Regions:
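Zn2+-dependent metallopeptidase catalytic core
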Residues: 1, 18, 49-51, 59-77, ...
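Short, solvent-exposed aromatic-acidic interface loops
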Residues: 79-87
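Juxtacatalytic substrate-recognition/specificity segment
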Residues: 115-247
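Metalloprotease/metallohydrolase-associated module, dominated by Zn2+-dependent proteases
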Residues: 244-256
Length: 256
């Protein structure tokens, strides 16, 4: 039997000797960086919108299995550690605990993908919704400069050895009208106006592209200022309720 006793909590009566398998539906029609989205063109989710938290098991390792729809040619991008995946990225993933599981969003679809290294660290950039005239090489080169500058700002002496991640992923959703970002431990989810992307033969940076680079810089800086250096209230998240702090003036203001 399953019964709900809180807005975010359910109790299940089950036998200890038997495996428990749950099937449930989730809302996936929020085309932002916050929750989840799924249609015939693209899929995206934060673990907090899909993955239930088992009380008392938050510190245990968590596995995630991702299966492609029959006939799909989608690919997968995420910062979560893969265990056994195919060329498209579908398969098995592993998180060391629940916090890591829900702090690694997934992007799925026929997106544009590019790679670069910053201070010797692999970085990946994927974009859903990019137009044909998009200049990927320009975006990668400019983003690389941003990343190297910020890594050296935080780790001047040993940037490669001291960076808080071994690989980083940018996930950008280019839409008709939108703007925003959400930082994660080794990735960031971004949304921008499609017209803000750099185009081939663009001689001068457009105002929109400058705004996009500012967003990229801001969210990447949060890798340290929020994800590493953070309020005491965020040391251990309480997923049953809102988590408040009076220090956003610093964590958002200083980052900007």
């Amino acid at each position: 039997a399953v019964f709900q006793d809180h807005k975010s909590q359910w109790h299940i009566d089950c036998k200890n000797s038997a495996a428990l398998e749950l099937t449930y539906e989730v809302y996936a029609f929020d085309n932002s960086v916050r929750t989840a989205w799924l249609d015939t063109q693209r899929g995206f989710f934060n673990g907090t919108s899909l993955c239930l938290r088992v009380h008392g098991q938050e510190d245990a390792a968590h596995g995630l299995s991702l299966k492609a729809a029959k006939g799909s040619n989608w690919s997968v991008a995420t910062g979560l550690q893969s265990v056994k995946v195919n060329k498209q990225g579908f398969g098995e993933y592993l998180a060391s605990n629940y916090d890591e599981l829900v702090d690694c969003p997934f992007e799925m679809g026929n997106f544009w993908r590019g790679e670069f290294t910053a201070c010797g660290i692999p970085h990946e950039f994927v974009i859903a919704g990019a137009m044909a005239s998009f200049d990927g090489a320009r975006l990668l080169a400019d983003t690389q400069k941003i990343c190297e500058t910020e890594i050296k700002f935080w780790h001047e002496k040993k940037p490669t050895a001291n960076a808080p991640y071994k690989r980083y992923v940018f996930m950008l959703n280019a839409v008709e009208d939108g703007y925003g970002g959400l930082e994660h431990r080794n990735s960031t989810a971004l949304i921008c106006n499609r017209r803000d992307l750099p185009t081939l033969n663009m001689k001068k940076m457009s105002e929109g592209y400058v705004t996009l680079l500012g967003l990229i810089s801001h969210e990447y800086f949060h890798t340290w200022n929020v994800k590493q250096l953070r309020p005491a209230e965020f040391k251990r998240y309480d997923y049953t309720q809102e988590n408040y702090t009076e220090l956003l003036w610093f964590f958002e203001g200083f980052t900007s």
